[in-house]
Design a protein with these regions (language model features):
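Phosphate-end processing signature that detects enzymes handling 5′-triphosphorylated RNA
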Residues: 1-249
Length: 249
């Protein structure tokens, strides 16, 4: 990790205000998962093409998230069953910038991710009436949800020096609920965020050279499955086997 931090700190910085130009609240996402041992080589090759978000001189930022779902885990099952127009609801604390939001993500029938959010004072395990009203406004109807699990990680956010592209890398991921806990600390989850899908991305080109290939993966769904092995999971089995192989190799 010391080597990784040293390489990341060599990247040219970009501020939050500058990054607003590539906020991409409606976007195409492409995810990747790979062993953390590949990170130094990957970062060195990315260096000429990307800047890194810097807040108060820090380029690695902690995120805390509390995910909500229905009692029957509708959001998890919608994802598992490949239903379009599906949602995720969470509180997320951006620790470094001291900001917390209630966030709602929609994956629409065109494969685009649309994120709506409203600022809140802190993460709450119980939704306030104001929270519920906001969720109804965004989703379009009332829905009863409850806190399910925490997912915490450190994130590095890259912004391409020329293209309208952002890239996040999540490190040291941990998850827990009231009964169990686990982690994916040996794995990096990267996500390319683009206005329009383009395989010409410098990250995608470099990743392919290092045999890092795209994978559809959800931190919420994988942690749900790990914490609740009895949930429906047949369509996620290949992904779980892939992640287990990354961890064990």
């Amino acid at each position: 990790m010391i080597e990784v931090e040293k390489i990341i700190n060599e990247f040219q910085p970009i501020s939050l205000n500058e990054m607003d130009e590539v906020k991409l609240m409606s976007r195409n996402d492409t995810k990747f998962a790979f062993r953390s041992s590949k990170l130094p080589q990957l970062l060195n090759q990315m260096y000429p093409f990307y800047r890194v978000l810097s807040i108060d001189g820090l380029k690695i930022h902690d995120y805390k998230s509390l995910y909500f779902d229905t009692k029957e885990r509708k959001f998890y099952l919608d994802h598992h069953n490949r239903r379009v127009n599906r949602n995720k609801i969470r509180f997320r604390e951006y620790v470094g910038s001291k900001l917390t939001f209630l966030e709602i993500k929609l994956k629409n029938n065109k494969g685009r991710t649309i994120k709506k959010r409203t600022k809140v004072k802190k993460i709450n395990e119980h939704l306030s009436e104001e929270n519920k009203s906001y969720i109804k406004k965004v989703i379009g109807h009332d829905i009863e949800v409850e806190a399910k699990q925490w997912i915490n990680f450190s994130r590095v956010t890259f912004v391409h020096i020329k293209d309208k592209e952002r890239l996040t890398m999540d490190l040291n991921l941990t998850y827990h609920d009231k009964n169990d806990k686990g982690d994916l600390k040996k794995i990096i989850i990267a996500e390319v965020k683009q206005e329009k899908m383009s395989r010409k991305s410098d990250f995608m080109r470099i990743a392919k050279q290092l045999s890092i290939l795209p994978i559809r993966i959800s931190k919420y769904c994988i942690s749900t499955l790990k914490l609740n092995p009895v949930v429906k999971s047949n369509r996620f089995k290949e992904k779980v086997l892939f992640l287990n192989k990354l961890i064990s190799n």
